[in-house]
């Protein structure tokens, strides 16, 4: 705009809100139906069939809560529980090196107040394991009774994934449990 022989930028006289309203923005957009939204929200990750492609190793197992009920979607979904107190280790050893892009852990305790710590590691054949995450969570029967951790990872040629559980950081050393462990 020209005023009194001077070139003046019109935007200098507009408030930031007015500037946004006058900008010529061309956003690409597509109108979608409610049915397509509902079907996409029901999308579920294609989890690995760990029973078919790996061996599970555990330091302890309550016969009523076997590791396969935490690692697979088949049968009862009671999760895994240790038969002994104290730190426990669960390993998933793949038959062949496998790429992973997602790891999901679910823990649940509605009965005991405790602070749990877990360490999740992975390794390639012949190499030392590498830490993915170490985390603590406090369970409380009247508050936080479940923990869900969903990790996006970029891991190639994975031979082993290991979960180390300290079920209770207090001296009592509670019983470790795992509701579900999925990988994709």
What positions do the PLM features span?
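Short beta-strand-plus-loop segments that form exposed binding edges in beta-rich domains
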Residues: 163-172
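A cross-taxa feature marking solvent-exposed loop/turn segments within ectodomains of secreted
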Residues: 98, 113-115, 156, 171
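N-terminal amphipathic/basic-hydrophobic helices that include classical n-h-c signal peptides
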Residues: 1-26
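Short, surface-exposed beta-strand/strand-loop-strand elements in extracellular ectodomains
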Residues: 113-126
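Extracellular carbohydrate recognition and processing domains
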Residues: 130-153
């Amino acid at each position: 705009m020209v005023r009194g022989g001077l070139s003046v930028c019109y935007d200098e006289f507009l408030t930031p809100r007015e500037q946004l309203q006058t900008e010529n923005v061309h956003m690409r957009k597509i109108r979608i139906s409610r049915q397509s939204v509902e079907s996409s929200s029901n999308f579920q990750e294609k989890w690995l069939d760990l029973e078919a492609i790996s061996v599970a190793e555990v330091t302890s197992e309550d016969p009523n809560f076997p590791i396969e009920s935490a690692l697979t979607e088949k049968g009862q979904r009671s999760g895994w529980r240790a038969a002994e107190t104290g730190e426990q280790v669960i390993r998933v050893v793949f038959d062949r090196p496998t790429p992973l892009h997602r790891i999901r852990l679910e823990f649940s305790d509605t009965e005991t107040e405790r602070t749990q710590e877990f360490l999740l590691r992975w390794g390639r054949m012949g190499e030392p394991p590498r830490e993915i995450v170490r985390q603590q969570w406090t369970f409380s029967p009247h508050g936080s009774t479940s923990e869900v951790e969903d990790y996006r990872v970029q891991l190639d040629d994975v031979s082993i994934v290991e979960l180390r559980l300290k079920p209770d950081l207090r001296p009592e050393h509670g019983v470790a449990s795992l509701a579900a462990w999925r990988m994709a």
